[in-house]
């Protein structure tokens, strides 16, 4: 199995302090809030979640100044938080603004 691609619309709820990895690469922890209506088994279902995410490199620097609560489309892949912590984390590899922030 190779496929591990996530695209999600959400809002930047929290942003950590820009830090650097031991290799000197910028890194930024994020919390993304998502809310939508999805179709499941022919019915409408409200989907809500908060997703832990991390951005690395130039994207981390760019997101370190992103205004909170702005609608964004994020793309990336899922992996575990660390060797000892199995929580899922979205590693963001792409970000695009959505609309004018009124959605």
Can you name each region flagged by the protein language model?
Residues 1-103:
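Single-stranded nucleic acid-binding surfaces, predominantly the OB-fold ssDNA-binding core
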